[in-house]
Regions:
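Conserved beta-strand in the GNAT
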Residues: 47, 53-61, 66-73
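Active-site rim helix/loop that mediates acceptor-substrate recognition in acyltransferases
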Residues: 23-51
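Conserved active-site alpha-helix within GNAT-family acetyltransferase domains
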Residues: 105-128
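A contiguous, mid-protein "functional segment" used to position or interact
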Residues: 124-157
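Conserved GNAT acetyl-CoA-binding A-motif
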Residues: 95-109
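Short amphipathic alpha-helix that is part of the acyltransferase structural core
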Residues: 1-29, 143-145, 155-176
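Conserved acetyl-CoA-binding loop-helix of GNAT-fold acetyltransferases
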Residues: 74, 80-94
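Short beta-strand micro-motifs in enzyme catalytic cores
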Residues: 44-46, 67-70, 140-146
Length: 176
């Protein structure tokens, strides 16, 4: 059975190393900045476990009207075994909120597979222009916004944009 286990101080570095392995530098925070996020009440950094065995990690933020998944990564050696799908199903039932996430435009085969994975879970690709703020004072990253269970209307997108800028990405400026 899939569980989301909050990462403790003792396990933080080892789980964070898996985040480094799964995401390019420009799509994640430095370790010190990631630790600052724990000061925000909306922040969740969890290990995904199955029968107490670690199968991946997820970083998400819970807001009043939506849940934002910032990162999810299943351990390389056990991908395509349904852990990602089951993790999203758990989020859907545990939080009963619309879920929003960012993904790269589908240009490579891997990116196309990733978008298809999310679409198979019921996520919709929104058409809003969106650029993820830089984690390292470099160039921002153009990404697509996906949402579950439906497309975001303009008001919902504006709320997502504003709240993630104020809370999620403000952490980058060390203002926790």
């Amino acid at each position: 059975m899939i569980n989301l286990k909050p990462v403790t101080d003792e396990k933080f570095s080892s789980v964070y190393k898996r985040l480094i392995d799964a995401f390019p530098y420009e799509e994640r925070r430095d370790e010190a900045d990631e630790k600052k996020c724990f000061l925000k009440s909306q922040f969740n950094f969890c290990e995904i476990t199955d029968e107490n065995e670690s199968v991946g990690l997820i970083v998400f933020w819970v807001f009043n009207k939506f849940l934002f998944v910032e990162h999810i990564a299943i351990n390389k050696e056990i991908r395509s075994k349904g852990y990602g799908s089951r993790t999203f199903e758990l989020l859907k039932t545990q939080y009963n909120l619309p879920i929003i996430l960012e993904a790269e435009s589908p240009e490579t085969e891997m990116q196309k597979k990733r978008i298809k994975f999310y679409e198979n879970l019921g996520f919709k690709v929104n058409s809003y222009d969106y650029t993820q703020p830089s984690y390292h004072n470099a160039e921002s990253v153009p990404l697509q916004i996906l949402s579950f269970p439906q497309l975001l209307n303009e008001k919902e997108f504006d709320a997502f944009f504003r709240e993630t800028r104020e809370v999620v990405y403000e952490v980058l400026n060390a203002e926790c």
